[in-house]
Amino acid sequence: MSQNDPKIDVKALGKVAVLMGGTSAEREVSLMSGGGVLQALRSRGVDAHAFDPAHSDLSELKAHGYSRCFIALHGRHGEDGTVQGALELLGIPYTGPGVMASSIAMDKIMTKRIWRADGLPTPDWRLVSSSAETAQAFQELGAPMIVKPSREGSTIGLTKVTSLGQCEQAYRLAAQHDPEVLCEQFIDGDETTCPILGQGAEARALPVIRIEAPQGNYDYQNKYFTDVTQYHCPSGLPEAEEREIQRIVVQAYRTLGCRGWARADIMIRASDRKPFLLEINTSPGMTGHSLVPMSANASGISYPDLCLRILASASLDALQGRAGAAGGREPV
């Protein structure tokens, strides 16, 4: 796709608000994502403007004549269905999945339940509400175990627990961010991620990225603010493994009813090379360290053209019909 791609009429996109910042724990990252998207869209001739919901009421979007929104918000009140619901009421098309899919994907526990019911592989888990239950989960799931808030992103509030004595502190940290705490079996192996673009039968996976972080610690700092993490795209995985990851993430995306774009995180167990879905991000990062632009670039889509393509896919649940709002759950 190029600036002059006849499929996308830039003028028809109208006045665009890039929603960035917000009030979640991921505000800083969102501002970086939104700044990059804003610059990219303007470079393609889009009438794009920054809009921070932390400083302006969403109702102002209608009053100021915005015709669509690029959601570059991350975390709560950004990719959890709340902003999407407000935009539905305002009648302003927005990027990414709709209200229900966004809400479900933000909830890691609900997401895992749906994936498991659909036969998709995801690590065993327990939902806990106390440090004692966390200790019990550790005894059942074994070491190491991941403890994290059910509804946060960017590894915020996450602890890798290797001993029973760590359970209380790990629970307290996660519970600071969410009353629902997820204890998840740790999968030892290759960490990968894979973006998806499109909707329903047209949804397609982009190239897989393999991630190598220092001591396997792909935390908030290593994700966004250091250059020590290594990203491999092409992934270097056997072709059959890459195809299987792409097949699984597209099915996971469709099962949740996603549209527009998302990025799924997958671990490949070292012992038998089996892939396990960890979570799906419905408003992925678009910073200089972000992975969707990296994967898109490997498939020949530049950062500005990626932003333009995502923006052009903006829609409303109300425009989809019931089947479309559910993402068109066709078999893969």
UniProtKB/Swiss-Prot annotation:
Cite the ATP-grasp domain residue spans from the record.
112-312
User: Which UniProt key words apply to this protein?
Assistant: ATP-binding, Cell shape, Cell wall biogenesis/degradation, Cytoplasm, Ligase, Magnesium, Manganese, Metal-binding, Nucleotide-binding, Peptidoglycan synthesis
Q: SUPFAM superfamilies, per this entry?
A: Glutathione synthetase ATP-binding domain-like, PreATP-grasp domain
Its required cofactor(s), as named, are: Mg(2+); Mn(2+)
Write down the EC number: 6.3.2.4
Q: In which pathway does it act?
A: Cell wall biogenesis; peptidoglycan biosynthesis
One Gene Ontology term, aspect cellular component: cytosol
**Ligand binding (Mg(2+) 2):** E279, N281
Top-tier EC class: ligase
The protein's superkingdom reads: Bacteria
Asked whether the UniProt record includes Magnesium among its keywords, one would answer yes
Could you tell me what the cofactor note in this record states? Binds 2 magnesium or manganese ions per subunit.
Q: From the UniProt record, list the reaction(s) this protein catalyses.
A: 2 D-alanine + ATP = D-alanyl-D-alanine + ADP + phosphate + H(+)
Q: Where does Mg(2+) 1 bind?
A: D265, E279
GO BP, sorted A to Z = cell wall organization; peptidoglycan biosynthetic process; regulation of cell shape
Q: What does this protein do?
A: Cell wall formation.
Q: What family does this belong to?
A: Belongs to the D-alanine--D-alanine ligase family.
Q: Which HAMAP family match?
A: Dala_Dala_lig
Q: What is this protein called?
A: D-alanine--D-alanine ligase
What species does this protein belong to? Acidovorax ebreus (strain TPSY)
